[in-house]
Structures are given as C-alpha cells and as structure tokens.
C-alpha cells in the first residue's frame, strides 16, 4: 500500500534535527533526476546504489532550491552556450563575458553563484563521487565533493562549469573526449593565458612555483 505520511511531531523533529524549515517537508515531489542529464565523471566506477544515492541528493537540492527561490531573489544564470567552441576559446569567451579580465579567480564558488549557478556540497556518504553537474530547466547546478583539497575542489568546479557550457543538455557520462575537453576548459578558465605568460619567466625556483600556485589557486603538479 501507500507509504504513510509522517505525523506533524515527526516532521517538526526532522526539521529541528536537520535545521530545515518545516514547510520544506510538505513540498510536492519534483521530477526525478536521471543519469542521462548528469555529468557523472566517474559513473562507470559507481555502484548502482552509489549512483542512485547521488541522484537522490540532487533531487533534494532541487527541492531546497525551489523553496529558497520562491522566497528570495537569486541571480539569473549568465552562462553561454559554447557547444561549438574549442574548450580553450570557450573558457576565454566566458571569462570575457563575465568581465573577468586576466586576473586570477579569488573565490570560485562565489563567482559561480554570482553568475546564477546553484552550487551544492555533497555529504560525506557521497565522497566516492568526484562531482557532477546538470541543467534543470534554465537553472545550472554543480554538486561538489568537498572532501578534497581546496585546489582540487576549484578545479572540479571549473570542470563542471565546462560541462554546463560545452555539453549543454547532452551529457554522455564520462566519455574520454568529453572529460578531456572539460579539463582543458578548466585549466584555461582558472589560469588566463596572458596572465600565465606574464608570470612564467619569474617562476624559476620551487619557492616561486609555490607562489604561482597560490596566485592561481591550483595544484603545483
């Protein structure tokens, strides 16, 4: 038979324990997120249970976003459709569109959120998932594994941004060419080519290499 609805006392207890508003638990269910719409980089290595759990986390994020969006004015998506662009040219085009110039990105997550990307952190039970992204209507989402170094998380965010602009609504879940394109985009987006060339001549020691790493927020390797 049908699953019984939890009582009001149970809902209030859940809301208190999870620090969610009580009304959130009375939202109607939205359409479930399917694997075909998601940029699962490590899909082939995930078990069905791990994949379904990550998708369920995405569904929960959609519900939460819907509740927040009804009550607060959130930035509209300011992404470009760059499906026909070379990954490096696409990264430069998006930096230009966002008026970023050549300067390093101080805070990747804040940048994405200011441009209308909804960014969510995956809970510890999903740490086997690198990261994933998808479009929900006209709203782009990125889900990050935050149990990594700050540099790795920045790169993951830029990699998923690549999927959102290069592979819009056409995710192929881990194809090598798709992932290589996303990596190329991420590298070019995080480190502007002109800024890199301007600093390469000064990076002639390990100390300067570490300084360059701090400048761009990327791994030395």
Predicted regions and their residues:
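Short juxta-domain linker segments that transition from a proline/glycine-rich
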Residues: 1-221
């Amino acid at each position: 038979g049908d699953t019984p609805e939890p009582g009001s006392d149970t809902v209030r207890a859940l809301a208190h324990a999870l620090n969610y508003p009580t009304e959130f638990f009375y939202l109607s269910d939205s359409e479930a997120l399917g694997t075909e719409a998601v940029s699962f980089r490590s899909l082939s290595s995930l078990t069905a249970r791990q994949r379904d759990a990550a998708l369920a986390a995405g569904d929960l994020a959609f519900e939460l976003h819907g509740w927040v969006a009804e009550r607060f004015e959130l930035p509209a998506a300011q992404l470009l459709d760059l499906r026909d662009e070379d990954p490096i040219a696409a990264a430069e085009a998006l930096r230009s569109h966002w008026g970023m110039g050549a300067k390093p990105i101080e805070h990747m997550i804040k940048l994405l959120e200011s441009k209308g990307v909804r960014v969510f952190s995956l809970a510890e039970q999903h740490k086997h998932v690198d990261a994933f992204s998808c479009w929900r209507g006209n709203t782009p989402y990125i889900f990050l594994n935050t149990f990594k170094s700050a540099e790795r998380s920045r790169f993951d965010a830029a990699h998923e941004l690549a999927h959102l602009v290069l592979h819009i609504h056409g995710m192929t879940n881990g194809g090598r060419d798709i992932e290589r394109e996303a990596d190329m985009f991420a590298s070019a987006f995080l480190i502007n080519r002109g800024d890199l060339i301007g600093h390469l001549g000064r990076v002639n020691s390990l100390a300067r290499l570490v300084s360059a790493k701090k400048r761009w927020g990327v791994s030395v390797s």
